[in-house]
Amino acid sequence: MGKNVVVLGTQWGDEGKGKIVDLLTEQAAAVVRYQGGHNAGHTLVIDGEKTVLHLIPSGILREGVQCLIGNGVVLAPDALLREITKLEEKGVPVRERLRISPSCPLILSYHVALDQAREKARGEAKIGTTGRGIGPAYEDKVARRGLRVGDLFHRERFAAKLGELLDYHNFVLQHYYKEPAIDFQKTLDEAMEYAELLKPMMADVAATLHDLRKHGKDIMFEGAQGSLLDIDHGTYPYVTSSNTTAGGTATGSGFGPLYLDYVLGITKAYTTRVGSGPFPTELFDDVGAYLAKRGHEFGATTGRARRCGWFDAVILRRAIEINSISGLCLTKLDVLDGLDVVRLCVGYKNADGDVLEAPTDADSYIGLQPVYEEMPGWSESTVGAKTLEELPANARAYIKRVEELVGAPIDIISTGPDRNETIILRHPFA
C-alpha cells in the first residue's frame, strides 16, 4: 500500500515547504497542488541552483514524478505558461508530466485589475495581497459566476460568460474605483490562445489520484501559504482566500480525508510574515535585522521584505490542532547560529495580566504582549548538519523545548537551503 502525505505551512507562509516537498518526492509518484494560485512562491535549491515555482508542484524537478494541479487552485494561464517556458529552457519536460483539472477557476486580467484597485483604495488599511487576482477569482467561484479552465475549450460559451462578467466587473472598476475598463475582445483572444496550449495538459485529477492510490503509489499533497493565512482559521481579514489547512486537501483535489496517512507541518525556527496583520513576536531591533539578513527574508513572489520575530509556540499549537499534524519539520535552524540568547513565545498576556492562547481574528490580537522563555544560544554552525549528534548541545535543547511546548514531534530538521542539508529523524513515507 502506498502512503499519502500532506505537506503544509504552520505559520504565515514562507516556511520552506518547497525544499521539503522536493526532498520527499524522491519517494512520491505524484505531487499535487490543491489550493492557492501563483501568489505562492516555493524556492528550491538543488546543487546550488535556485528555482522558484509559483503554480507548478515542486515535484517537477524530480524525473518521472507526475505533477497535478487540483480543482482548488485558481489558475492564471499566462503565469503558468511563463513558468512552463522557464522550466523547459532548463530541459525539464513539463508538458509531459503536468496535468491540470478542468475545474480550476481561471484568473484573468479583470481579476488582477480589481485586486490592485482595491488595495490602492484601501490606502494604509490595505491587506497586503500580492495583487495577482487571487481573491477576486475565488470570489467569482463562490458567487458561481466564474470561468473555469474547462470553459476555455468552448468558445461560444466562454464568450457569453465573459461578456456577462465584464459587464459586472467593468461597472465596478469604472464607477467605483475610477479605473479603466477591461477590453472584451482582447481578453477573449488571449484566452483562446491559452486554450490551445493548455488543452493537452487537461485531466480528471481526482480520477488520476484514485487510480494511483489503487495501484499502491505514494502521493504528496503540496500546500501553499501557511495555516495562519487560512480564510477560515487565519488572522482574518489578513488572510488569503483559500483553505490553506489540511481540510483543503480533500476539497481542492477530490481525494477524501480518510485516504490521508500523514500531515507534515513545516515551521521555521523563528517566525516571519509578509504584508499586514498581527504578529505578536515581531522584532524591530538588531536581532530582527539579523534574522532577516541571515535568513534572506524576502518574498519569493513579491520580493517584499518579510517581517521577522521570535518563534511563537502559541500559533504553532493552534496550527497543530486544526491540521491534525502528525509531525513537524523545523526549517532554517541555521539562521539562529551566532545568537547569544534565543527566545520562544509560550503565551500572550492581555492588559489584565491573563495569559491567553491564540485568538481567531486580527482585532483580538490588539494589546496582547508575548510571554517569553529564554534559552542560551549557540556559536557553532549548524549549516549542513546531517545528524542530530552533529548539532550543538544548545541547538538540540532548543529543538527539544519546541517539541515540549507544541506537543508534536519534530521529524525533520532543515540545516540549509539545499535538499542535502537535512536531518530526517522519521520519514513521512516510512
Curated annotation (Swiss-Prot):
InterPro entries: Adenylosuccin_syn_GTP-bd (IPR018220), Adenylosuccin_syn_Lys_AS (IPR033128), Adenylosuccinate_synth_dom1 (IPR042109), Adenylosuccinate_synth_dom2 (IPR042110), Adenylosuccinate_synth_dom3 (IPR042111), Adenylosuccinate_synthetase (IPR001114), P-loop_NTPase (IPR027417). CDD domains: AdSS. The active site is at D14 (proton acceptor), H42 (proton donor). Binds 1 Mg(2+) ion per subunit. It is found in: Cytoplasm. It comes from the Bacteria. Pathway: Purine metabolism; AMP biosynthesis via de novo pathway; AMP from IMP: step 1/2. Its EC number is 6.3.4.4. IMP binds at D14, E15, G16, K17, N39, A40, G41, H42, T130, R144, Q225, T240, R304. Belongs to the adenylosuccinate synthetase family. Homodimer. Plays an important role in the de novo pathway of purine nucleotide biosynthesis. Catalyzes the first committed step in the biosynthesis of AMP from IMP. This is Adenylosuccinate synthetase. It comes from Pseudomonas aeruginosa (strain ATCC 15692 / DSM 22644 / CIP 104116 / JCM 14847 / LMG 12228 / 1C / PRS 101 / PAO1).
